[in-house]
């Protein structure tokens, strides 16, 4: 269901290409290639869909409550006008915190900087894209990226 929904959303050449290549690698159980394609797509979609106060923010600021401040304010306004309290609870108590936490883990090095030489025990874009990962990427990690893409499209894609 998630993949079909993403195929319907991704109609531009670059989004189709990255999703197609990512899914081909996924079917071939090449999870490292899958993660590379899907993380590039995730970065692209977040930057296109989210109203960041400043597109040139560091990842640490961008993928925080401060970075999502404009988007959250607009969602709060729209949900108040159109949907009600349950939708606000789902968005602000569940979806936003989970999405921001996942994006932080994927895009921000935190304690696991290259110079420390300790690889994170989870998928991190910098370690992967800079050729520093020394472990296999698991299938479930690629499914997590697909889930994040689906959540982003659900939350921000129809604006």
Model features per residue range: what roles?
Residues 1-32:
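Charged alpha-helical initiation segments
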């Amino acid at each position: 269901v998630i993949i079909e929904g993403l195929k319907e959303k991704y109609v531009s050449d670059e989004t189709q290409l990255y999703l197609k290549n990512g899914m081909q690698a996924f079917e071939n159980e090449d999870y490292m290639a899958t993660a590379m394609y899907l993380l590039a797509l995730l970065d692209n979609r977040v930057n296109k869909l989210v109203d960041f106060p400043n597109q040139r923010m560091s990842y640490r600021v961008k993928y925080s409550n401060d970075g999502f401040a404009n988007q959250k304010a607009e969602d709060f306004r729209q949900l108040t006008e159109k949907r009600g309290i349950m939708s606000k609870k789902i968005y602000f108590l569940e979806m936003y915190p989970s999405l921001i936490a996942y994006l932080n883990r994927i895009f921000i090095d935190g304690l696991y900087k290259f110079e420390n030489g300790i690889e994170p025990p989870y998928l991190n874009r910098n370690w992967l894209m800079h050729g520093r990962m020394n472990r296999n990427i698991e299938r479930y990690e690629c499914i997590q990226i697909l889930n994040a893409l689906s959540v982003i499209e659900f939350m921000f894609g129809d604006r």
